[in-house]
């Protein structure tokens, strides 16, 4: 095992086994409460959604499949008329504020012009239609959310300063926004408007809002908002900051298309990351942070039992959901040794602050820098794991059982995608997930169950 004094990046050519990005529907349809997601694909896409989301059809979830048939692929059917018919049916049954069309691999292959059809159908049915190509051509399944948010970004209203406007113009501009967000959007105190982007549960969003409010920073809005009608206003005077590492496309769209100012901060995962995230936002607004060091120390003290279990243990990230760098940095701060950070895709510009914090954390903890492997080859990873014998492997579901059979403790990386991992108070939930397989093995050892017995053939 080579040890590195600086971060080293490698790139392999491996095929990674991960979910399809259309799985983003699972959490986005719950986050945007007045939305409806229409996935346009084949029966394979439908089977995947039915199995992965685990929602029975009689539950009437706010998503559906538009299954392509031979007539669609051979251009015998009119795509515009078929999609219009489905959207009218959705409008009649659910009447959402927005319909999101999710393109798939098949719509890419047959060159279905969803972007051209959507404006016509939108005009005819009177409901906004957002097109997002969340297909399997992306690197990781979490990038499905990135694609959807980048598409929704174009639908956010334009930010305009209302102070210098005439009365008539002011009323016209204000009417674009919802009653609930109007005052917060236009009357930000002592600092420019701040919009946070990334889909997190409402409780987590409230916690992050509260942490910033302690520093006299008020969040103008979230992308996505809980309701499509409450999207935040965007423009040159608006600052934006991400909460998830896989939203590089959204960040680029916010900067280039909407002219927002991006705050490049580490991500609020773990007490150290949350403190660095808040400090960076404060520094941009010229605000001196108050009580952050004490707040972080208090959280670390509350995590003492978990830290005692993790200290000195080793972990290997195979790469699955683009949360790997942030989680690795947090676990290194907890005293763990990270042998390798496999990651399907690395945007070094968007994650620059996170990579810098990772490097500083390794130096602070006197731990060798982990190697970062982009697009890792799974076969090569297995060979390296056989040599290193880590105490824990954080991996995709496809590799978990084979690794367990070879005596390596595993944790599904997808669990971190759906768990509440952001902010100070949720650090315990992250460590609860990480330590569960280690605690399970400790319990089995006390029972004397140390060997796997092969079944006897009679």
UniProtKB/Swiss-Prot annotation:
Gene: chlN
Residues involved in [4Fe-4S] cluster binding: 20, 45, 105
Organism: Angiopteris evecta
HAMAP family to which the protein is assigned, alphabetical: ChlN_BchN
Pathway membership, UniProt: Porphyrin-containing compound metabolism; chlorophyll biosynthesis (light-independent)
UniProt cofactor note: Binds 1 [4Fe-4S] cluster per heterodimer. The cluster is bound at the heterodimer interface by residues from both subunits.
Taxonomic placement: Eukaryota, Viridiplantae, Streptophyta, Embryophyta, Tracheophyta
Cofactor(s) it depends on: [4Fe-4S] cluster
UniProt subunit comment: Protochlorophyllide reductase is composed of three subunits; ChlL, ChlN and ChlB. Forms a heterotetramer of two ChlB and two ChlN subunits.
Gene Ontology CC terms: chloroplast
Signal peptide per UniProt: none
A matching Pfam family: Oxidored_nitro
UniProt catalytic activity: chlorophyllide a + oxidized 2[4Fe-4S]-[ferredoxin] + 2 ADP + 2 phosphate = protochlorophyllide a + reduced 2[4Fe-4S]-[ferredoxin] + 2 ATP + 2 H2O
Protein name per the record: Light-independent protochlorophyllide reductase subunit N
NCBIfam families: DPOR_bchN (TIGR01279), PRK02842.1 (NF002768)
Protein task: Component of the dark-operative protochlorophyllide reductase (DPOR) that uses Mg-ATP and reduced ferredoxin to reduce ring D of protochlorophyllide (Pchlide) to form chlorophyllide a (Chlide). This reaction is light-independent. The NB-protein (ChlN-ChlB) is the catalytic component of the complex.
